[in-house]
Amino acid sequence: MVPFWAGLLVLSALPQTLGFLQHSEEPYVPGEWVLLHVVQGHIGAGNYSYLRLNHEGRIILHMQSLKGDADLYVSDKTLRPNFDTYKLQSTTCGPDVVVVPGDFLRPVGIGIYGHPSYMESEFEMKVFYDQKALAEIEIEKNSYSSDETPGQPRQSQGPEDTEEEEESILWTILIGILKIILEILF
């Protein structure tokens, strides 16, 4: 009987110990990332807190739940994303990380949800700007292949792709009609 209670005591203390270890670790931050903001807050169980992101470029949201469990929902379609209307999410019990692509429309809506398992969740979110993505865009913009001259835009292979796509659609329609005929006959 004593081993059962001792095991139960160890299991009940384990989440607190893991939580302590989790908070003491700092996330790895590459040299290309620039810290833009640090946002701290509290959120009640089952509630949302909303933020707006206006920065252009590739943005990394790194959120750590200091107490409880806060989840992260992101969208470029609505400023109030939730678990039904998000484009990106991170709902882990540990650090939540979301990479917002540079081609997302601005402003980007950020929803922070307090998990109902905890009366209150406390979080800290660090907002990073990825300079490496900007450098890659500049390199791509300024590069050209050997058959192009500098300063001229690259030509896409549009007509060939369009013909293949039209042919694929025709085959799909034809196969669909044949399936219907076979289903009627048999």
Swiss-Prot record:
The glycosylation sites annotated in the UniProt record are 47
Q: What is its subcellular localisation? A: Secreted
Sorted alphabetically, the keyword list is:
Glycoprotein, Secreted, Signal
Disordered: annotated segments: 141-165
A cellular component term (GO) from this record? Answer: extracellular region
Q: Which residues form the signal peptide?
A: 1-19
- Is this entry keyworded Oxidoreductase? no
| Entry keyword Membrane | no
Known InterPro entries for this protein? Answer: UPF0669 (IPR031420)
Q: Which superkingdom heads the taxonomic lineage of this protein's source?
A: Eukaryota
Q: Where is the composition biased (Polar residues)?
A: 142-159
Sorted alphabetically, which Pfam families does this protein's record hold?
Answer: UPF0669 (PF17065)
Checking PANTHER family in the record gives:
UPF0669 PROTEIN C6ORF120 (PTHR31703:SF2)
Which family would the database say this protein is a member of? Belongs to the UPF0669 family.
What is this protein's name? UPF0669 protein C6orf120 homolog
